[in-house]
């Protein structure tokens, strides 16, 4: 720093560092709204693993209901979680944390080359060709109902499974994003 004033600061730039490149795979995560720290953990890890957009989804089995002021506070909190995760992992761009929406709203607006809904009885994630953009739909505690899975399929989503075990709602995005980055991204 060369000079500090009441309203200004003058600095001299000694060295420019290249920012960490983002993954070539653009990922939009639709994450079922979950209780307490589970949602924080899912957002934190999804940010660290390169998600570009994260949308909390209100679905049939969702146990969390956010209204007005409380929803605004949670959204601000989740955005701070993403900022902290970016600082921790050295990521130079923040993911967009969208306000919570219903499943129907998200399904009608999700745009991606490959849209996947996680389901324990489906083809493996590895059976899909490389996309440039990817949307993942992950259910809340208790999962998505069969009607919701069918609704997602009708909206152009393909059912995919991550393996032989059913994962917790906060674990599924970690595994899904890790596998996607390994297959098609920058791992």
Residue ranges with predicted function:
Residues 101-107, 123-125, 167:
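A short acidic, often aromatic-flanked loop/helix-cap motif at beta-alpha or helix-coil junctions
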Residues 110-149, 157-160:
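Active-site/ligand-binding-proximal alpha/beta "capping" segment
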Residues 5-6, 10, 14-116:
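RNA substrate-binding interface of SAM-dependent RNA methyltransferases
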Residues 38, 141-145, 165:
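Gly/Ser/Thr-rich beta-alpha loop segments that engage phosphate groups in nucleotides
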Residues 1-3:
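Conserved hydrophobic positions within beta-strands
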Residues 33, 140, 170-171:
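Conserved residues at beta->alpha junctions
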Residues 146-187:
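Structured adenosyl-cofactor binding patch, chiefly the S-adenosyl-L-methionine
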């Amino acid at each position: 720093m060369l000079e500090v004033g009441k309203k200004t600061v003058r600095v001299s730039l000694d060295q420019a560092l290249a920012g960490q490149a983002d993954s070539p795979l653009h990922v939009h995560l639709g994450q079922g709204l979950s209780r307490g720290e589970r949602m924080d953990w899912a957002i934190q890890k999804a940010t660290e693993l390169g998600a570009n957009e994260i949308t909390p989804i209100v679905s049939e089995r969702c146990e969390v209901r956010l209204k007005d002021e409380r929803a605004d506070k949670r959204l601000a909190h989740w955005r701070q979680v993403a900022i902290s995760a970016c600082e921790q992992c050295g990521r130079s761009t923040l993911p967009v944390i969208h306000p919570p929406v219903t499943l129907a709203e998200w399904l009608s607006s999700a745009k991606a080359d490959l849209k996947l809904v996680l389901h324990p009885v489906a083809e493996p994630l590895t059976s899909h060709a490389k996309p440039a953009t990817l949307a993942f739909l992950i259910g809340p505690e208790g999962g998505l109902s069969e009607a919701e899975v069918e609704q997602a399929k009708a909206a152009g989503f393909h059912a995919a499974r991550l393996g032989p075990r059913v994962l917790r709602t906060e674990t599924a995005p970690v595994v899904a994003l890790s596998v996607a980055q390994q297959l098609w991204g920058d791992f």
